[in-house]
Design a protein with these regions (language model features):
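Conserved RNase H-like, two-metal-ion catalytic cores of nucleic-acid enzymes
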Residues: 3-4, 8, 14-53, 69-70, ...
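Short hydrophobic beta-strand that contains or immediately precedes a catalytic carboxylate
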Residues: 5-6, 128-130, 329, 398-399, ...
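Extended two-metal-dependent nuclease catalytic cores across DNA- and RNA-processing enzymes
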Residues: 22-23, 73-250
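Active-site-proximal helix-loop-helix substrate-binding element of RNase H-like nuclease domains
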Residues: 99, 152-180, 187, 300-305, ...
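Conserved "right-hand" nucleotidyltransferase catalytic core of DNA-directed polymerases
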Residues: 234-358, 375-378, 395, 443-621, ...
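Function-dense linear segments that define catalytic or interfacial modules
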Residues: 344-348, 408-431, 440-442, 447, ...
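Conserved catalytic core of nucleic-acid polymerases
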Residues: 429, 484, 582, 592, ...
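C-terminal polymerase-core module
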Residues: 503-510, 514-566, 733-781, 785-787, ...
Length: 868
């Protein structure tokens, strides 16, 4: 049989530290459990085991502590956030049919060693999964060690057997114990021989084999005198370390591989635990029946009648039924970004209106303009897109389940109906079509009303009704119309610019090759590192396991060391500009000559809107060449672009919500806030503030908004950490209201578990309760800056809704086409451009009443470049 043995403590630690803190609604941490079980699933896919054993350490001294009192001394205790998850993880593993093993007085490593030895004896295959290299000593006689590690920020698993260890270390797996005996192990506080490092220890074992061989002929072996003296001095410690580092194979456990065969476990208990932990996706990953309850029965609340699916052949008949219902629930079915069907649950019947029927356009126009019904949908932006294409405007959409779920759980990765059904404990009825095939979409459509009932109550409890109905719901329509409108582009101009970049890239390539002395792949960090640090001999300050680091920070530090570095930096900038922006944009120009981006309303935790396919919010502006790209975004013939941008909106929000009178007065007097801050922080009159001092004050201002500390600020503005700290301290002394606000926000978030904007948007912060200082500090930074960033995001959303309504109310042809952070762009007929600019700036400046007046700067141009 194939036996998979997991080093439970090692794997759970990797899971805990590798995944951001996750909590249930009640605040129970779940990230270690979630990560561990996902790792287990991947291991099963790799090894296809018949049996699984999960070995855990027992929280008590072992025989090694009796041998050496300082064994593992100094190890930090397990974080409480992880400790609390351990018993539940073990309970879940048993419920899922796995066997956990704990052996008092012994370590989990010894359980691994004992099971590995048993498999060797029985001829069974054994896979040991761990993150600890100590286990490599077991990789012989048919035992393979799956070593989990991190490479380039990604989790990878290396498979070790005797051949792999010989290739990497030049010795046998068993000889690795001898290496450890010499070099010691600081993580376990195993002493080794003081002054003998990993390189020397490995060399000694490669040449002489064992401690016994080394010490037998210590005086005559070819060993450096200094090393020989160290070996002689610490002989006892070397042998002690050998004993401590040797994994035993005789732990008193049931070592028969068959004992660890995976059983059926207790599926109902597992489902109940997954529900309690709100880890709904794992129910499906482990192929469990989501409706099971303890006792083995299937949950009863499923409808007595199974859903019926009826494809609509008469649009008027369905319209009559929907008018009679009054409250209409609808789920758009999507394929490749296009609506293929509309599903309408009425009781246990789901009426389907296919998009390819001749009556579809008439049906959509009639339903979405019908004032006698209220529409409650899922992803209603798609309904608005349908309406726009039919030349009507929806005025009867009263709810969107996806938006409600997002407001309630802004940190979730997805909000699909199946996930929401699990999260809110709504049973999904089974449905099979006439071909006896499952059709989940029909079953999910039936439960839409019940899901709405549950989320609506929670929205009201959270005080987010106004946020939903006055901002998010109408915004979905605005975004849909912007997507349909798109942005006109100069295709020929982009193509010409791409060719220009290609020419310059080719020239740079030749110059780089000439400087280095040979051709190589400039895009390969490994080859570039060799070229810079070996061929050219430039000073290397940062080297990783995979080679030399050649990131932007490293190259910036080498800029003055050799002229080729400047060329490499330019090469990188231009290749990114060409591939991502020029060539990337050319691929997505639609048949109408415009680019139609998609806006995601439910992605960011702060409430900001994101853009994708393509991401027009990432068009570069920091470099002259990057800004050139904006010249290719143009107004349609006979039109102009109206561009308005909030002036320092986040700082204005900060001044208002902190009630700092000094900052409020500076803004409302019309003073330049960065100059005013510089004058206060540096103790100089405004007229003596140089551009450099203003730039530093600007960095401090925005650093406060984004929660950066002295280290990051020092790096940004090129000063010492001490100077940066002095700037921040002086800032807080100047703006004492801001300092008090920061502390209030942290205290409030600790009390409630979340940070909130002026409009009630929440971001939950389990990190604030973390025992780990770094995690807790992160939570405090978010508690300080989320209300600022989130409120700014809410304000521009309000402005978008109002601009859209105003343009429509005044029967103008002008239309919003893009939002980028704090900037709105309207495409307007030439005759309407001035009026459109007036409307946009008015609505942006009056979107929210605060102590500091909002200001929007607007401009009109033929291209995005001209208008900005």
């Amino acid at each position: 049989m194939n036996l998979l043995v997991l080093d439970g403590n090692s794997i759970v630690n990797r899971a805990f530290y590798g995944i951001k803190l996750l909590t249930t609604k009640s605040g129970y941490y779940t990230n270690a459990i979630y990560g561990f079980l996902n790792i287990l699933l991947k291991l099963q896919d790799t090894c296809h085991p018949d049996g699984v054993a999960v070995a855990f350490d027992v929280h008590e001294p072992t025989f090694r502590h009796k041998q050496y009192a300082d064994y593992k001394a100094g190890r930090k205790p397990m974080p409480q956030e992880l400790r609390a998850q351990m018993p539940v993880l073990k309970e879940l593993l048993i419920a899922l049919g796995y066997t956990t093993v704990e052996c008092p007085g012994w370590e989990a490593d010894d359980v691994l060693g004992t099971l590995a030895a048993a498999c060797r004896d029985s001829g069974d295959t054994c896979f040991i999964a761990t993150g600890d290299r100590d286990a490599l000593q077991l990789a012989h006689g048919g035992v393979k060690v799956l070593l989990a590690r991190t490479k380039m920020g990604q989790a990878v698993t290396d498979v070790y057997d005797e051949a792999a260890i010989a290739a990497e270390y030049g010795i046998t797996p068993q000889a690795l114990i001898q290496v450890k005996a010499l070099q010691g192990d600081s993580s376990d506080n195993i002493p080794g021989v003081a002054g003998v490092g990993a390189k020397t220890a490995l060399d000694l074992v490669q040449r002489f084999g064992t401690l016994d061989a080394i010490y037998k002929d210590l005086d005559t072996l070819d060993i450096k005198p200094g090393v020989r003296e160290k070996l002689r001095r610490d002989k006892d410690k070397a042998y002690l370390s050998l004993d401590l580092g040797t994994i035993r194979s005789n732990a008193p456990i049931d070592a028969a591989p068959a004992h660890y065969a995976v059983t059926g476990g207790d599926p109902a208990a597992a489902v109940a635990l997954f529900r309690k932990l709100e880890l709904f996706s794992l129910i499906d990953k482990f192929n469990l029946d989501r409706d099971l309850v303890p006792g083995g029965e299937t949950e009863a609340p499923a409808p007595a009648h199974q859903p019926e699916r009826l494809t609509c052949v008469d649009a008027d008949d369905l319209l009559t039924r929907l008018r009679k219902a009054g409250d209409v629930y609808v789920v758009p079915q999507m394929a490749e970004g296009t609506v293929t069907d509309l599903f309408f649950p009425l009781g246990d019947t789901v009426f389907v209106m296919p998009a390819d029927t001749p009556e579809f356009g008439y049906f959509v126009r009639t339903l979405l303009a019908e004032d006698t019904v209220r529409i409650f949908g899922y992803n209603t932006k798609e309904l608005h897109r349908l309406a726009q294409k039919q030349g009507v405007r929806c005025g009867n959409i009263c709810g969107d389940l996806q938006l409600s779920a997002y407001l309630l759980r802004p940190s979730d990765a997805k909000y699909d109906l199946a996930q929401l059904a699990l999260e809110y404990n709504v049973p999904v009825p089974a449905y099979r079509n006439s071909l006896d095939q499952e059709e989940p979409a029909v079953a999910l459509a039936v439960i839409l009303p019940e899901l709405f009932a549950k989320t609506d109550a929670l929205i009201d409890d959270a005080g987010q009704r106004k946020l939903l109905t006055e901002i998010e719901l109408p915004l979905a329509g605005v975004l849909a119309r912007m997507e349909c409108a798109g942005f006109d582009v100069d295709k020929a101009g982009i193509e010409a610019f791409s060719k220009k970049l290609s020419t310059r890239i080719s020239t740079l390539t030749d110059e780089i090759f000439e400087a280095v002395g040979h051709e190589f792949n400039i895009n390969s960090p490994k080859q570039l590192g060799v070229a810079l640090f070996e061929d050219l001999g430039l000073p290397c300050k940062k080297k990783t396991k995979s080679g030399y680091s050649t990131n932007a920070e490293v190259l910036e530090g080498l800029r003055s060391a050799h002229p080729v570095v400047e060329k490499i930096m330019e090469y990188r900038t231009l290749t990114k500009l060409k591939s991502t922006y020029c060539d990337g944009l050319l691929k997505v120009i639609d048949t109408d000559g415009r680019i139609h981006t998609r806006f995601n309303q439910v992605e960011t935790r702060t409430g900001r809107i994101s853009s994708l396919e393509p991401n027009l919010q990432n068009i570069p502006i920091r470099t002259d060449l990057g800004r050139e790209m904006r010249k290719f975004f143009i107004a349609a013939p006979g039109c102009r672009l109206v561009d308005a941008d909030y002036s320092q909106i986040e700082l204005r929000v900060l001044a208002s919500i902190s009630e700092d009178q000094t900052m409020i007065d500076a803004f409302n007097s019309g003073a330049d806030i960065h100059t005013a801050t510089a004058a206060q922080v540096f103790g100089l009159p405004p007229e003596m503030i140089t551009p450099q001092l203003r730039s530093r004050a600007k960095a401090v201002n925005f650093g406060i908004v984004y929660g950066i500390g002295a280290f990051s600020l020092a790096k940004d503005i090129g000063v010492s950490n001490k100077e940066a700290k002095e700037y921040i301290d002086s800032y807080m002394h100047t703006y004492q209201g801001v300092a008090a606000y920061m502390q209030r926000m942290i205290d409030a978030a600790k009390d409630t578990g979340y940070a909130t904007t002026l409009f009630g948007r929440r971001r939950y912060l389990p990190e604030l309760a973390a025992s780990n200082h770094m995690l807790r500090a992160f939570g405090e930074r978010v508690a300080r800056n989320m209300p600022i960033q989130g409120t700014a995001a809410d304000i521009i959303k309000i402005a978008m809704v109002r601009v859209d309504r105003r343009l429509y109310a005044e029967r103008m042809e002008s239309r919003l086409i893009l939002q980028v952070h704090d900037e709105l762009i309207v495409e307007a007929p030439e005759a309407e451009a001035d009026r459109a600019l007036q409307i946009v700036t008015e609505e942006m400046e009056h979107a929210c009443d605060m102590a500091v007046l909002l200001r929007a700067d607007g401009k009109i141009g033929q291209t995005w470049y001209d208008a900005h």
